[in-house]
Amino acid sequence: IYLKLQKGKNIKNIKNFFEKKNYTFLKILKANKIPEIKDVVGTNYCFFNIFPDRIKDRIIIISVIDNLIKGAAGQAIQNMNLKYNFKEDEGLNFNPIFP
């Protein structure tokens, strides 16, 4: 994803925002680590990181999900949990599938 930065914002501001929010299934990676699908297979997590673009005031966001879990099925369970006041990760926070 390519995004233009707002005036006065930088990558550090954006990373701090997501780290403070502490979303249940959204994890921002440290340093310059590129997210890999192998890290999210069989989970409901979305791993992402933010990088500077070669064009001034633009950033690149790279994210990965396992579309079998984080896709429609996992999203439906997560939304149901929120609607019925269950823990957001109920039924979704389990060990990943074995190869």
Region spans (language model):
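C-terminal substrate-binding/catalytic lobe of Rossmann-fold NAD(P)-dependent oxidoreductases
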Residues: I1-I62
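NAD(P)-dependent Rossmann-like dehydrogenase/reductase catalytic/cofactor-binding core
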Residues: F47-P99
